[in-house]
């Protein structure tokens, strides 16, 4: 068990802001906060992993699927949903390599290199790929909630008429209209805030903006998913 990748983005953003604050204000006391900020996740992760390993009577928690698998998957075309979305590649490649983390990592790196070569050879295809991936993830005001509910409700026969109306009927269109409005309103307000914060050169006010833009950059390469954008929307 370890710090989730999305949480790592926020951690890195906070570290960047603290370092810039220390440089600008010559505040050496910030070093203490930096050590705590970096050390606390490591200590807690180690403690949790140790407890789980002890409970499972293992020497250590297996490494599992490498993070490179999610990057490789994020650079693959996906005709079922959209480019870079989940396609079970991470699990498939892990099983193909007999659950060997090292061998899986090598296979994922080969896949990443192949994707990069294809993008480099076909720049227009590359731009189209990332455009579709970016739009499909960040222009979803429902953050994948509606399609997820639909997926998991298709084989249930105990749903109320109200639920059916909002999942499959015209109620779905009403919800989409409401979500489109508040989604646009929040993004517009956030953009204005980010612009004003940059003009004022106030580091503390730029933390949230840095987290959001870090998320944008991170998910250009990582596996895409509408639900991943929800935490940044809250920020």
Where is each model-derived feature located?
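Structural signal for the C-terminal ends of transmembrane alpha-helices
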Residues: 16-26, 194-200
């Amino acid at each position: 068990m370890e710090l989730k990748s999305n949480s790592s983005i926020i951690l890195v953003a906070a570290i960047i802001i603290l370092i810039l604050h220390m440089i600008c204000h010559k505040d050496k006391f910030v070093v203490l906060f930096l050590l705590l900020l970096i050390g606390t996740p490591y200590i807690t992760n180690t403690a949790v992993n140790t407890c789980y390993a002890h409970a499972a009577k293992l020497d250590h928690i297996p490494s599992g699927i490498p993070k490179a698998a999610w990057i490789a998957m994020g650079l693959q075309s996906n005709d079922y949903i959209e480019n870079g979305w989940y396609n079970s590649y991470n699990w498939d490649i892990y099983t193909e390599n007999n659950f060997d983390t090292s061998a899986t990592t090598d296979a994922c790196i080969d896949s990443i290199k192949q994707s990069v070569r294809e993008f480099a050879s076909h720049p227009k295809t590359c731009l189209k790929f990332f455009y579709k991936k970016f739009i499909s993830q960040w222009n979803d005001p429902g953050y994948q909630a509606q399609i997820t509910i639909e997926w998991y409700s298709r084989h249930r026969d105990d749903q109320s008429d109200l639920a059916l109306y909002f999942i499959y009927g015209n109620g779905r269109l009403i919800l989409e209209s409401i979500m489109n409005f508040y989604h646009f309103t929040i993004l517009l307000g956030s953009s204005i805030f980010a612009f004003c914060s940059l003009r004022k050169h106030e580091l503390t006010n730029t933390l949230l903006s840095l987290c959001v833009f870090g998320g944008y950059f991170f998910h250009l390469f990582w596996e895409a998913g509408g639900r991943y954008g929800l935490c940044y929307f809250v920020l």
